[in-house]
Amino acid sequence: MLMSSSHFRIAMSTLKKSVEDMQYILATDVGSTTTKARFFHKKDGVWRFYVAGEAPTTVEAPYEDVTLGVQNAVREVEELTGHKLLNPDGSGLILPYDGKQGVDLYCTTSSAGGGLQMMVAGLIKNMTAESANRAALGAGAIVMDVIARDDGRQPYQKIQRIRNLRPDMLLLAGGTDGGAGQHVMEIAELIKAAEPKPRLGASYSLPIVYAGNKSIRDAIAKLFKDEFALTSVDNIRPVLEQENTEPARRAVHELFMEHVMSHAPGYNRLMRWTDVPIMPTPAGEGMAIQLIADTFKVNVLGVGLGGATTNVYSIVEGRFVRSVSANLGMSYSVTNVMKEAGISNIMRWIPFKIEEEEVASRLMNKMIRPTTIPQTLEDLMVEHAVAREALRLGLQHHRTIATRLKGVQVQRTISDMFEQAIQDSYVEMMTIDVIAGTGGLLSHAPRRVQPMLILSDAWLPEGVTRMYQDSVFMMPHLGVTSTVYRDAAWSIFDKDCLVRIGTSIAAAGTGKLGEHCMTVELTMPDGNVQKEEMNFGDIKLVPLAEGQEVKAVINPAKTFDVGKGPGKSKEALVIGGIAGIMLDARGRPLYLPEDNTQRRDLLYKWLTSLKLYPEDPLKELVK
C-alpha cells in the first residue's frame, strides 16, 4: 500500500476556495540553512511553476523566529512577480487570492532545527523493533537509536543511552496482539526509569507513541500516566505475518506538529499561517517520489543526495520505504563518506593520477567550507567520485531496511528459532523501472548525462530503467501540495520539475573485455531500425529526444540477462530524454581492473564515449 496522505488531507471546508477554483499556490521548505519559497500559478487551465524565492532560515539566535525567513523568501517572490502576497501587518499571507493579490493555498515543509529526531524501542531487534524503525523513517524522522531486548546492551547502558539522547519523540512497539506482555512492559519500565527529556526544552512532556500488543495498553497508560504524553495506536505487528506501520506513522506526524513544531522558535506562528499541517521535509520528498510511482504505476527508487544526509526512497509493488543515512552527504558529511567507503573506493572512480592524501585534503577542505562549489574539472570529478560512493552506501543501508518481514517462516529448527537471519532485501535492480534523483550535485550537474552515469555506477541498474531528476529543488514543496491538490502537484512536477534524462539498457552478468555482450535493435521514430552491437566493457549513448518513444529488442549473449533470464530476448518501449538511451554492456557487478593504468584507461574510454566532460580539458588532465 502506498503511504497514505489521508492524515494530511484537510476538510475542504477549511480551505478558503475549492481546489478547482484556485489560481495561485505558495509552498515553502524551511531548511536548516535556507528557506525556499516556490510560487505556482494556473495559466490557461494548466498549473505551472511561476517563480522561486529564497532567504536564510531564521531559526537560530539572534532571530529565533522561522517566520522572518519565510517572509524574506516570500518578499523575493513578490519582488520578482509584482504580485502582493504578505499582509502589511506581518500577520502572514493574504488568503485567498481576491483577483488582485494573495494566494489560495499556503503549505510548508520543514527540516530546520534538526528536523524530527526520534528514538525507537521494540521487543526483538529483527522483528518489532525493525518494523517500528521503518514506521519512524517513513514519517520523515531521523532515528537516533533502536532499543531492543536483544540488542546486546545491559539495562543500565540502555537507560544511559535513552537519557543522553534527548529525542523529540519515542516510538514503542512489541508483541503480537493478545500475546504475552511481560517483556514489552520491561522495556516500558526501562524508558520510565531513564526519565528522558525532550530535545526542545523541559517545559513539556515527551511524546511517546505506543504501537505494540493492544492487550497491555491500559498497563502502559498506567505506567506512563504522569510523565509522558502517551498516544496509543494499532499494533505495528498485530500478527507476525503482517506489518501495519500506517497508524504509527500518522500518529508521529500529528505529534510532530502538536508537540515538536509548536516548541520550535516561531513555528506556532507559522502553523497559524498554513492551510495544512507542517510536514517534515523528507516526508514531502517521499510523497513526490510516490507521485511518480502512482502516476506511472511503476517501481521507483529515488534519492535525495544532500549536504549532510542521503535519503533513499523505494516504492516496490506499492510498498513505500524510506531510509536516511544521516552521516552520508556531499558537504558537511563528506569526510564521513570517505571514512565509510574507504579512500580506495573513491580513488577507483578517478581517471587521472592523483595522490590519496591530495584527495583526502580536498575533502576535508570541503567539510570546513561546505558551501564551496567545484571550480575546476579536477574538483568536479573528485566530487562525482565521492557522490558515487555516498549513493552506493546509501542504497546498501536502504536495503537493510527494505526487507521482507522477518519471523514469518514456519519451518524452523530449534537452533534458529530465535536467530533471525538477515533476509534479502526485495529491492532488486532488475525490478526497478524508474530511478529519480534530487539534491544539489545531481540537479546542478553541468551536463545532464553526468547524473545518469553517476547513478548507474553507484546503483547498477539492470534491464531497462528510466532515469529522472529534478530541475529546480521543489520535490518537498510538490509532495506537501499533493496532499491537498494532487492534480496541480503532478501537473507542475511533470512539466516544470521532472527532467527526463533518458533510459538505461544494462545487461547483468560478467564476461571478458571485448567479448560479445548484447545486440540492441531500436525502431527509430523515422521507421529505420538501428542495430547496436555491444561488447563487454562498452558503454554508448544513442540520441533520442525527450518525448520520443522507440521499440527496443534486446538480445543478450547466453551468460547475460536483461530481465527475461540469461540469454533470453526482451522487448521494451524505450523513452528518450536529454541524454538519450544509454547502452551499458559493462556487466553487473561492475568490473574495474586492479591495475591503476588499465583502470584509468577504461574509465577514460567510458567518459569520452558518453561525452561526460569537455573533451580537451579531460584529455589534458589524464595525460
PLM segments and residue spans:
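Short flexible coil/turn linkers enriched for glycine and charged/polar residues
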Residues: 31-33, 112-115, 306
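Conserved protein kinase catalytic core
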Residues: 32-35, 310, 441, 445
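A mobile "lid/hinge" subdomain adjacent to the ATP/sugar-phosphate binding pocket shared
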Residues: 352-382
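N-terminal-proximal low-complexity accessory segments that begin disordered
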Residues: 29-41
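Active-site proximal loops enriched in glycine and acidic residues that flank catalytic Cys/His/Asp
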Residues: 304-307, 314-316, 332, 395, ...
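Nucleotide/phosphate-binding catalytic cleft detector across ATP-hydrolyzing
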Residues: 2-27, 41-48, 54-299, 379-388, ...
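Short, well-ordered loop/turn and helix-capping segments at boundaries between secondary-structure elements
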Residues: 318, 330, 334, 352, ...
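Glycine-rich phosphate-binding loop of actin/hexokinase-like ATP-binding domains
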Residues: 39-58, 287-361, 446-469
